[in-house]
């Protein structure tokens, strides 16, 4: 709250949306680590080591290449056009309906995605802390989102650049602290710790079997495409980058962030190995759901300091992804649908505050709806379906950037809606259609290609 007060004094709508383009690039780079490593990552990655070893690092290697592509291809475009909402590019290139379609798909996917991630983290916090005080889940969610609204409603992205830095510090510190505590309990020096992790069977990084879902090429290529789309074509992630002073600083931020992110993931994976070693040495049964491994050990076996660090870390992870998502939703809706830029400052403030409150309420309602469903498979299915909306966004941007053809703008919404539906049915019956082949992350690429094909069909040369 103190950071919010300091950063939001005299903040206008320009500060809320762009940070007045004065953010220090190194703060943006460090803060993006926490925003990218959501609460789901914080809980899931260490436990998943027991199932897939370090194979996740292959995907992260693709992420790093994707970050570099965003830095050299997309950031120059956004700075050249001086964009606030990145979906304004679609208006310039195709027309108003294409523009609204791209932005609408972002709003749906980001709202559901942010709610899903916050729902999972709120569930852990509810069991670990709030249930002891008989605080109902809905109140936990209202207070959580309410706090985010309080510290972001005035300063927006200008505040988030600074709060994300603090949240990333808490998140990474929690992991490092847990590793140190485990290594001390096992009497391992620094060198022995590194040797123990690197020699453990769970530290295998590369998998070359083609029929394995962990195959290097599948993971690496998927990592590239998913990053280009879910970072480079995502208002949430790009809004932070566009607060840097100029293109050069934004690119510098992206390159430094990519290395920081890579190191952070190695820490999470290393923690996973240490958790399994600790459990094995102490005869602790591994939970049926590996997602429960880190919370179970942190809160039940490592002592109060680690338990507190874990709760701080997971809270930081939840807030760092949810606060920027809420601000991005407000920005996109205000600019892309309410045309906020054409009004005077007083009217802009009213529109911005109203939009911010609207999406705060929607976020709460979606999370409570997930809880009411009380069926994890249904909730996960809703999250996956929302993820299909990124395919048309990929197709629209790629076609707009690399083709000079002019589309019939009124047909673009139909193409954008059809591509995910076609993709869904192909994915559902892929094992029958393609001799047992099952789609994974590459489904995003297929979705984008179907969109591009559809756009080609409804387009003509200039």
What is the meaning of each model-derived region?
Residues 1-462:
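Membrane-embedded helix-loop-helix hairpins and adjacent transmembrane boundary segments
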